Curated annotation (Swiss-Prot):
ATP binds at G122, S123, N124, G125, K126, S127, T128. Cell wall formation. Catalyzes the addition of glutamate to the nucleotide precursor UDP-N-acetylmuramoyl-L-alanine (UMA). Its EC number is 6.3.2.9. Pathway: Cell wall biogenesis; peptidoglycan biosynthesis. This is UDP-N-acetylmuramoylalanine--D-glutamate ligase. SUPFAM superfamilies: MurCD N-terminal domain (SSF51984), MurD-like peptide ligases, catalytic domain (SSF53623), MurD-like peptide ligases, peptide-binding domain (SSF53244). Its main location: cytoplasm. Belongs to the MurCDEF family. The gene is murD.
């Protein structure tokens, strides 16, 4: 992608979050002429500290916040859009109509990277699978860099010139502005309703996810999820993965062999389900996806086997917290959408006598009907919190006990009263946390702290 760094007209970086600041550092190092904008009037002190450091290094950089200057945007050579700023923003659309090129940090990264890139997206499981693939490569002795939507912004990964493989978690927000991904391996794990406050429909959200496929050399997709099926593209290798569905014989595939209880690649068992340390049916699917990706990316399977045997899961993703009076407490605060919560409930069902679910928060415009069906099938009681608690309650059948709590602290204590020995208290909100907390991590920490207060 030639000449992504314009010199005759200014580049405008929109957004001063983690990604926007990484773009600004990258452009400053290139000696580019650029503006740094943000729509927010009030920015954190830490942001201004980083901006001051950038201005000291790049005095020509201009900064503005509180609104988007249409005249500046429409006269720019390029706009580098941060993931938190929708492509549909009116000022951005005006610039696009004026012929301004709009790109994201992924485009800048791909234009400069020297090593193969694996990109992983999906409504849920992408952080876990990205971590597993990264660990597999590391265990195999490769110099691997992991980042994107998880941890380090992609442009910061370029600092190490000796990287042999990049493994990136990519969100729909990041993929919106990608012109052509051109990944070596591209994977969509699953698609379920999320960010319906940003996308007009599930179809639009799905289209954003599938942008990861365009230009990819190899594609990995979920045979059980029709929304992940890629378009037919000549010369592209396809890998399907599934825990229960058969495939066409001419397609590469990773399946669960029920006869041997093993994960198999193209009909050959690779390793046992018993090798997977992280629990739940949803994590079995994550392992299947990781195996398909490792094969596509030429990562030795021994590295993945070690990762699966040792990896205990990420914080706030179906994380075991405690067992008190025979009741298990699991923190799945990262379940910020319906699909993720459903995966946790279905994946853990059958391992406990009953599930007492804590759910609720900001549903981001989601339709909770499908969640209601899963709750009605697997959950004995629900404690609801947050602004969208009434919407969830509306889809829960009367036979499922449903109570509301004003705080998460109160919800945990209420759930502890409802649970008996052999039961599970599961925090899997199916909602964002911003109506009550700074982020899902803060919500998860509050859950763990309150569990510690519950009488042993």
């Amino acid at each position: 992608m030639a000449n992504l760094i314009a010199t005759d007209n200014p580049i405008v970086v929109v957004g001063m979050g983690l990604t926007g600041l990484s773009v600004a550092r990258y452009l400053a190092n290139k000696g580019a002429n650029f503006f740094l904008l943000d729509t927010r009037k009030d920015l954190p002190k830490s942001t201004w500290q980083q901006v001051a450091e950038l201005q000291a290094k790049c005095p020509s950089m201009k900064v503005d916040n509180g609104s988007l200057d249409v005249e500046l945007l429409t006269s720019a050579k390029q706009i580098v859009l941060s993931p938190g700023v929708p492509l549909a923003t009116p000022e951005i659309q005006q610039a696009k109509a004026a012929g301004v090129e709009i790109i994201g940090d992924i485009d800048l990264f791909l234009a400069e990277r020297k090593a193969p890139v694996v990109g992983i997206t999906g409504s849920n499981g992408k952080s876990t699978v990205t971590t597993l693939v990264g660990l597999a490569a590391e265990n195999a002795g490769m110099n691997v860099a992991v980042g994107g939507n998880i941890g380090v912004p992609v442009l910061d990964l370029l600092a190490d010139a000796d990287v042999e493989l990049y493994v990136l978690e990519l969100s729909s927000f990041q993929l919106e502005s990608v012109k052509r991904a051109q990944l070596d391996v591209a994977c969509v794990l699953n698609v379920s309703p999320d960010h319906m406050d940003r996308y007009p429909s599930l179809a639009h959200y799905c289209q954003a996810k599938q942008r990861i496929y365009f230009g990819a050399k190899k594609i990995v997709y979920n045979l059980e999820d029709t929304l992940t099926i890629p378009p037919v593209m000549a010369g592209v290798e396809r890998y399907g993965f599934s825990s229960k569905k058969a495939v066409e014989e001419n397609e590469k595939h990773v399946l669960l062999n029920n006869d041997t209880n093993a994960l198999s690649l193209n009909g050959q068992d690779v390793f046992s389900v018993a090798d997977i340390k992280i629990a739940g049916a949803h994590n079995l699917k994550n392992a299947l996806a990781a195996l398909a990706i490792c094969d596509a990316a030429n990562i030795p399977f021994a590295g993945l086997k070690q990762a699966l045997q040792e990896f205990e899961g990420l914080p706030h993703r179906c994380q075991w917290v405690a067992n008190k009076n025979g009741v298990t407490y699991i923190n799945d605060s990262k379940a910020t959408n319906i699909g993720s919560a459903q995966a946790a409930i279905e994946g853990l069902a059958g391992q406990f006598k009953n599930i007492v679910l804590i759910a609720g928060g900001d549903g981001k415009g989601a339709d909770f009907s499908s969640l209601g069906k899963v709750i009605n099938q697997y959950v004995s009681a629900v404690v609801l919190i947050g602004v969208d608690a009434p919407k969830i309650q509306a889809v829960v059948d009367p036979q499922v006990m449903c109570v509301k709590a004003q705080t998460l602290n109160a919800a945990v204590k209420q759930a502890a009263l409802l649970a008996k020995s052999g039961d599970l208290v599961l925090l899997s909100p199916a909602c964002a946390s911003l109506d009550m907390f700074a982020n899902y991590e803060a919500r998860g920490h509050e859950f763990a702290l309150t569990v510690a207060e519950v009488s042993a």
